[in-house]
């Protein structure tokens, strides 16, 4: 693999790339209260194997192999946690989604990802969902998603269509601004 992707190996030697796993396969803590929580090493290996095998195509779990294994970050707000997932597949984030109270919907709020998350969290109506989107319904964050989610009683913030939100309440000990920073 290193021969085929020597450019990636050389970036790692320059200190640009860092392993998200410690030697004991636990995840790296970025700083106090912020840590990498996924994807699991097993899932990354499954995705990498699929990506390297030209007979299998370049998608896994309804997502491209590049996106499926996006890094997942957990931010501890005190009594609640926020999960940032990039473009990860729902399968890759399922276990972490169950442990978080505020979740970024993958792939800019793509409807199929949102519906799967709503199903995973169906017994938890207090979950807050964030759509990080600046493109509109072509890549996620559609009005249909907002409507469906709110009809089911979910709280959803969309960075494209709403003013910057500050997530705080008596539930959260710390507050963070949620919005687009360009």
Specify the residue positions occupied by each region the protein language model found:
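Active-site neighborhood of phospho(di)ester-bond hydrolases with catalytic His/Asp-centered motifs
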Residues: 1, 82-88, 99-112, 128-135, ...
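Binuclear metal-ion centers of metallo-dependent hydrolases, dominated by the metallo-beta-lactamase
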Residues: 1-43, 65-67, 125-182
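Short, low-complexity, polar/charged sequence segments that are solvent-exposed and flexible
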Residues: 53-57, 103, 122-125, 148-152
């Amino acid at each position: 693999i290193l021969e085929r992707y020597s450019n990636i190996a050389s970036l790692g030697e320059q200190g640009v790339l860092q392993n998200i796993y410690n030697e004991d396969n636990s995840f790296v803590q970025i700083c106090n209260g912020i840590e990498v929580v996924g994807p699991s090493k097993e899932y990354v290996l499954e995705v990498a194997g699929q990506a390297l095998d030209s007979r299998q195509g370049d998608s896994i779990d309804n997502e491209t192999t590049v996106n499926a294994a996006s890094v997942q970050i957990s931010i501890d707000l005190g009594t609640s946690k926020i999960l940032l997932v990039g473009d990860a597949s729902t399968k890759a984030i399922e276990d972490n989604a169950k442990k978080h109270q505020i979740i970024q919907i993958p792939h800019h709020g793509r409807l199929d990802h949102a519906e799967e998350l709503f199903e995973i969290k169906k017994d938890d109506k207090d979950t807050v969902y964030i759509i990080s989107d600046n493109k509109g319904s072509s890549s996620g964050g559609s009005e249909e998603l907002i409507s469906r989610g709110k009809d089911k009683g979910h709280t959803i913030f969309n960075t494209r269509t709403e003013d910057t939100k500050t997530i705080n309440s008596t539930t959260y000990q710390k507050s963070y601004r949620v919005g687009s920073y360009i």
